[in-house]
Regions:
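Membrane-interface helix-loop junctions in multi-pass transport and translocation proteins
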Residues: 158, 168-205, 216, 234, ...
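Helix-loop junctions and terminal segments of transmembrane helices
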Residues: 56-77, 148
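Short, small-residue-biased leader/transition segments that mark boundaries at the very start
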Residues: 1-14
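Interfacial segments at transmembrane-helix termini and the short loops linking adjacent helices
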Residues: 105-138
């Protein structure tokens, strides 16, 4: 996949800039102890950011799988086919990234404790709260990654880089202003990061729309996955809290909560007619999902 370095370049720049602003400029602004600043930034980048990148990486892998076919359709002058393909790619990305974002928001603390052991309560709370702040960026990054891949497939190689540059300016201004005028401290960086991803998402989406005159279907792409994810989030939280009362262990409680939540989401998505059998088949291991759904009488 030739396009990955191109996308990760601006994203890397985004973290480098955040790092410099928070660890170099901010301590001198507020006369703070640099050691604790570096420690806090380490928790942000090493745990919260790392965790939010997992679903984004998954979405990117699916995005890169779609690109050759979009490029072929455009080369064959089949704009209608390309639009359909793009629509399906965006929908697939949303169906996966919206529940991931909700799941990370609801189960931030137990998920961090599951992956990063031996943390003090204070570190755990900070990492979890930062992850909650970043959870929305999962959706934005997943969509902007997909759209920048599509733009490359359409031959607009520079557009995503220009958009990333614009977003970087927005992020930097936001980070500096928040650090100067609020007491949000490290949360300023998490908010600025989410703004960066949101800006990238909007600019890339516009560029794709301009390139192929394409309009995204809204209800099944965004609304139904969001509703199903809200149900799923409530279920995940209730199951986790219930198990935690009994087991007193975050790690033991979180795994069943994640598994049951995934099932709830899948069932809700199908019941609300958010996904068709054909779309389900285009998922990784889709034929298995269809088989299970038919066994459980969810699909006719």
């Amino acid at each position: 996949h030739t396009h990955h370095p191109k996308h990760s370049f601006p994203t890397r720049r985004s973290s480098d800039l955040n790092n410099s602003i928070y660890t170099k400029w901010y301590p001198s602004l507020r006369n703070l102890d640099t050691v604790s600043i570096y420690e806090k930034y380490g928790i942000f980048s090493g745990q919260s950011l790392t965790m939010s990148n997992i679903p984004i990486a998954f979405a990117s892998a699916m995005a890169s799988a779609m690109i050759p076919s979009v490029a072929q359709l455009i080369a064959a002058r089949d704009v209608k086919g390309a639009r359909e393909k793009i629509g399906l790619a965006v929908k697939t990305t949303m169906v996966i990234s919206i529940p991931c974002a909700v799941g990370l928001f609801v189960l931030a603390k137990p998920v961090i404790s599951l992956l990063f052991t031996n943390k003090t309560a204070e570190e755990l709370n900070l990492a979890a709260a930062l992850l909650m702040t970043l959870s929305l960026s999962v959706i934005f990054y997943a969509l902007s990654t997909l759209n920048s891949s599509i733009l490359q497939g359409l031959g607009k190689v520079n557009t995503p880089i220009i958009n990333a540059g614009i977003s970087l300016v927005v992020q930097t201004v936001a980070a500096v202003l928040l650090l100067m005028f609020t007491r949000l401290d490290l949360y300023s960086i998490a908010i600025a990061n989410t703004l960066y991803s949101g800006m990238m998402c909007v600019l890339n989406q516009w560029a794709v729309r301009r390139a192929v005159g394409y309009r995204q279907e809204i209800v099944k792409t965004f609304v139904i996955p969001a509703f199903a994810s809200a149900f799923m989030g409530a279920a995940a939280w209730a199951i986790y809290e219930g198990l935690y009362i009994v087991t007193k262990s975050m790690r033991i409680s979180v795994i069943p909560a994640i598994v049951i939540a995934a099932v709830v989401y899948f069932v809700m998505l199908i019941l609300m007619r958010g996904i068709t059998e054909q779309e389900l088949r285009s998922f990784p291991k889709g034929y298995l999902l269809v088989k299970v759904a038919k066994k459980c009488r969810l699909l006719r």
